[in-house]
Design a protein with these regions (language model features):
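Short capping segments at the starts of secondary-structure elements
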Residues: 22-25, 34-38
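Key DNA-contact positions within bacterial/archaeal DNA-binding proteins
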Residues: 51
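Short, locally clustered residues in the helix-turn-helix/winged-helix DNA-binding domain
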Residues: 17-20, 29-33
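Beta-hairpin "wing" of winged helix-turn-helix
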Residues: 62-71, 78
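Conserved segment of winged-helix/HTH DNA-binding domains
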Residues: 2-3, 11-12, 33, 74-94
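A short acidic, leucine-rich amphipathic alpha-helix
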Residues: 41-43
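Short helix-coil-helix linker/hinge
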Residues: 17-23, 80-83
């Protein structure tokens, strides 16, 4: 494999691992529909604790699938505008 092929393969692997969970898929679908939401909003919709929801959002953030913004005491999440092609391609399928 060439270096560019290896890089693309690793990027797809990272994105697929981040999305290989029904809760994280639900988060991405929710954010796709609503543009942005707080951790509390997302936790309520996917029926999960704030702590568990934050963990899932952290995984999505680490994979550059979502971005976050601190507003006052709340963290707001939205789909990343700078997604890698692998993440963008998969999100288009959802």
């Amino acid at each position: 494999m060439t270096n560019s092929t290896t890089k693309i393969t690793k990027e797809f692997e990272r994105v697929l691992k981040a999305l290989a969970n029904r809760r994280r898929l639900a988060i991405v679908q929710y954010l796709k529909k609503h543009n942005e939401a707080t951790v509390g909003d997302i936790a309520e919709i996917i029926e999960l604790s704030l702590k568990a929801t934050s963990k899932h959002l952290g995984i999505l953030f680490a994979a550059d699938i979502v971005e976050r913004e601190q507003r006052s005491l709340q963290m707001w999440y939205s789909l990343s505008l700078n997604q890698k092609p692998a993440a963008r391609g998969i999100n288009n399928l959802l």
